[in-house]
Amino acid sequence: MTKTIAINAGSSSLKWQLYEMPEEVVLAKGLIERIGLRDSVSTVKFADRSESQTLDIADHVQAVKILLDDLIRFDIIKSYDEITGVGHRVVAGGEYFKESSLVDEYALAKIEELSASAPLHNPGAASGIRAFKELLPDITSVAVFDTAFHTSMPEVAYRYPVPNRYYTDYQVRKYGAHGTSHQYVSQEAAKLLGKPIEETKIITAHVGNGVSITAVDGGKSVDTSMGLTPLGGVMMGTRTGDLDPAIIPFIIDREPDMADAERIRHVFNKESGLLGISEKSSDMRDIIAGKEAGDEKCTLAYDLYVDRLRKYIAQYFGVMNGADAIVFTAGIGENSADVRASVLDGLTWFGIEVDPEKNVFGRVGDITTADSAVKVFVIPTDEELVIARDVERLKTK
């Protein structure tokens, strides 16, 4: 038995889960927030206990040191030597990484180089990797890429209709994201369908603060909503999703300060989506509460969100010439019966029949009637488990 840590590091946070492998037993999990800010919070959950502490954490190295010390302090491990592998979620792997990879200095340099494709994610992941390499230099270090699952997309799906030089010189193309989640839930959906995944057509909807939809044909991603960066596709909590590119010069003509690329990136990534339309919140629970209270901006934000989700799901029926199932996963997908019902209400033409009671009260599994031509599943995602499995697989190579 060995112990593996799955890491999801952001610019100011570090989410982790410790597994006993290959048994896939979760020994502990935790979250460190506000890294680099005052009053950082570290939370550890294990054996039906939850322990939190507030302290100042300067950087990711200090965050990892606190994580490791907590594992000892709470007697979850006796020694650092028990940890033999660490897997890191990395959003953007570009065309360099077609699958999960052992991390050496070359791989780490490439991950940092690809930060332009995931400016909100890759820098944090790189910081997490460097922190573990400094503190536990001898363990197996693996990068698991959100984009890897989508490398099976055909060129017709991933190319943009811009001059060829932008692709050949700068690799401007669709890469997608949330691939680890889409891979996991599509495999689980195939089990629920009782069919080999190679014989299935599944539309997976990862609906959280970030949102992406993927067409999975025969277990392979054939199209996905996020694009060159995680900004593309469906409207999200604070991100625009797809836009007419002419909006950018149009706004710059009227607000010259928007000519700064960093300013545009910030507005479209941090001030848009549900937050931008509602002018209240990026949290769907707040949006629904506002809608129910008669707030017109919250109602519009909700309706726009549902509309964009429905359109992408519908278009992937066309991409695959049908679908056996739709899967909802991630925070909103798993927990908001309202959003699921609203989205599916506009897809009845495909033969979808939702069981209202199952949708409201059934947290996991099939939420359709026995007569539904297309099944709809609610499946909790488990990206950390996929990461731990890839570490175990690459350790034995």
Curated annotation (Swiss-Prot):
Catalyzes the formation of acetyl phosphate from acetate and ATP. Can also catalyze the reverse reaction. SUPFAM superfamilies: Actin-like ATPase domain. This is Acetate kinase. The active site is at residue 146. Belongs to the acetokinase family. The gene is ackA. It is found in: Cytoplasm. Signal peptide: none annotated.
